[in-house]
């Protein structure tokens, strides 16, 4: 989670017992500063560390977005004649040093990487960190990962990096058809949001929303991942149909795999005896509605699964 709500706000709500979520936060790496900020980041991790709100992760922005030519690409944008490839926000050599230091300190790295160059340099830095620090259960992950060079897809599994997609973006809206594919050409556009290919490579795929940029409703993301169509109308053409995934994999990406990214898979993410009952009940239709809640929706009841047939308060 890194959703424009500062750590002190979450911490204050937690202290007042008003935080109705379990929040795993990412501490932001300021790309205008250098290694001197590490002490501040360590202090924040120590300060924000309760069962309800903790910050084990550092988020590093590596590039911008495709629509305004700031995503970092391996090859130039095709709609410009100045050989422009976007912008890496951190030089590769410095990135290697940053990631190696943070990894050695036990931080999980959360990359913002949109373009194929940003994705490659993220993976390169994690490979350097692993060579220097050794292998550990780090669960580093990369978010957004819009455009892959297919040669880098197998590296996710090789380096134990989780692919954190926002599946709601993987359909042919105007951001894709008017602001993205014309900048890349058809050959590269084939590798936009290659969720199916990443799954087939054996990498762990988790889903998020990038709320509040787009809806936090996971049902929209699940439908988009399965159909590659507009989930609100289902009338758009399927966008790179070969990258569709099945329903079970889409649900897993939002549940057990997302719990895994947050080191919470022993407590939540699946319906098992002893786990937290973080669940809702829905009907089975595509145009579904949540069933009427038994309790007022602003009241949160902490539950654990006591048996396969009933729940009891924790």
For each predicted feature, which ranges?
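Short catalytic-loop micro-motif centered on adjacent basic/acidic residues
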Residues: 1-2, 108-113, 140-143, 206-208
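C-terminal cap of metal-dependent C-N hydrolases
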Residues: 217, 229-241, 246, 251-256, ...
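Divalent metal-coordination and catalytic microenvironments
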Residues: 55, 64, 112, 142, ...
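Short alpha-helix capping/helix-loop boundary micro-motifs
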Residues: 262-267
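C-terminal substrate/ligand-recognition segments
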Residues: 95-100, 104, 202-211, 247, ...
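Active-site-adjacent C-terminal substructures of enzyme catalytic domains
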Residues: 147-249
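Metal-coordinating catalytic core of metallo-dependent amide/deamination hydrolases
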Residues: 3-120, 124, 155-168, 222-224
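Conserved helix-loop functional segments at active or binding sites
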Residues: 101, 124-132, 260
């Amino acid at each position: 989670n890194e959703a424009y709500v500062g750590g002190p706000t979450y911490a204050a709500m937690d202290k007042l017992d008003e935080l109705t979520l379990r929040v795993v936060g990412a501490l932001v790496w300021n790309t205008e500063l250098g290694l001197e900020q590490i002490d501040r980041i360590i202090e924040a991790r120590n300060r924000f560390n309760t069962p309800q709100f903790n910050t084990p992760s550092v988020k590093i922005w590596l590039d911008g977005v495709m629509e305004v030519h700031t995503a970092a690409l391996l090859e130039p944008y095709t709609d410009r004649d100045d050989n422009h490839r976007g912008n890496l926000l951190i030089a590769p050599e410095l990135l290697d040093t940053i990631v190696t230091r943070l990894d050695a300190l036990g931080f999980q790295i959360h990359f913002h990487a949109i373009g194929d160059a940003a994705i490659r340099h993220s993976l390169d830095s994690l490979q350097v960190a692993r060579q220097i620090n050794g292998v550990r259960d780090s669960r580093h992950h990369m978010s957004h990962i819009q455009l892959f060079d297919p040669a880098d897809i197998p590296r996710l599994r090789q380096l134990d990096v989780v692919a954190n997609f926002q599946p709601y973006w993987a359909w042919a809206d105007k951001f894709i058809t008017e602001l993205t594919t014309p900048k890349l050409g058809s050959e590269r556009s084939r590798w936009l949001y290659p969720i199916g290919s990443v799954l087939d490579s054996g990498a762990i795929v988790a889903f998020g929303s990038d709320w509040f940029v787009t809806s936090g409703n996971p049902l929209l993301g699940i439908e988009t991942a399965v159909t590659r169509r507009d989930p609100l109308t289902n009338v758009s053409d399927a966008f790179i149909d070969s990258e569709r995934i099945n329903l079970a994999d889409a649900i897993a990406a939002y549940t057990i795999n997302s719990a895994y990214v947050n080191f919470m898979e022993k407590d939540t993410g699946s319906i098992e005896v002893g786990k937290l009952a973080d669940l809702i009940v829905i009907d089975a239709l595509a145009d579904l509605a949540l069933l009427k809640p038994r309790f007022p929706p602003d009241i949160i009841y902490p539950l654990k699964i006591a048996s396969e047939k009933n729940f009891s308060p924790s």
